[in-house]
């Protein structure tokens, strides 16, 4: 896989209602944070639409999206009509979000879902810690809560490092999402035992 030229953006949200505005959209709980947090924005069907970093500034919220695939500004503007806020969008330096950024993320065991095909991904498959199941309503909450409480999640998305060239001889129920350098991002059955992957498949979990 070659990392295509990303579309990294920053959006600043001003206004007295900025906290309440973003709280009603994101999966995480900004009321419990004072500096920064990661979160998802979902479709009504509970699929990942955006992965964002939110930085709490003195007079605004700074929203960072490493690869804006679906026009984050237009999405926020749709919900902003009933709130006392204003939005400003800035392009970020693409060089900071290229192959080196993506490779460093994989080495640290972090999957940036802005580089994956969003429309098929459940957020709990990737970074469940980006979801606060105790907070109030947000877009897609009903779906993700049902998956959580009824234990309907069937897949996990994990990062593995290849130790040999045979690592691509994968079982049929393994879905290869990304192959980049010496790393694979795989979608696996949730309860599969991967402790023997290194000896059997030449894969080491990151």
Model-derived features: positions:
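Basic, glycine/lysine-rich polyanion-binding surfaces/domains
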Residues: 1-206
């Amino acid at each position: 896989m070659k990392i295509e030229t990303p579309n990294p953006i920053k959006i600043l949200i001003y206004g007295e209602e900025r906290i309440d505005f973003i709280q009603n959209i994101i999966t995480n709980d900004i009321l419990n944070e004072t500096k920064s947090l990661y979160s998802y924005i979902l479709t009504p069907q509970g699929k990942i639409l955006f992965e964002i970093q939110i930085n709490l500034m003195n007079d605004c919220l700074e929203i960072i999206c490493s690869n804006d695939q679906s026009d984050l500004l237009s999405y926020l503007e749709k919900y902003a009509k009933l709130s006392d806020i204003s939005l400003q969008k800035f392009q970020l330096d693409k060089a900071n979000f290229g192959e080196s950024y993506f490779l460093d993320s994989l080495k640290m065991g972090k999957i940036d879902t802005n580089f994956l095909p969003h429309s098929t991904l459940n957020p709990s498959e990737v970074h469940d810690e980006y979801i606060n199941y105790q907070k109030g309503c947000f877009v897609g909450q009903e779906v993700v809560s049902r998956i959580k409480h009824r234990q309907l999640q069937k897949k996990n998305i994990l990062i593995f490092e290849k130790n040999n060239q045979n690592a691509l001889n994968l079982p049929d129920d393994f879905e290869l999402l990304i192959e980049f350098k010496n790393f694979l991002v795989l979608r696996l059955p949730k309860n599969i035992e991967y402790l023997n992957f290194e000896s059997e498949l030449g894969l080491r979990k990151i």
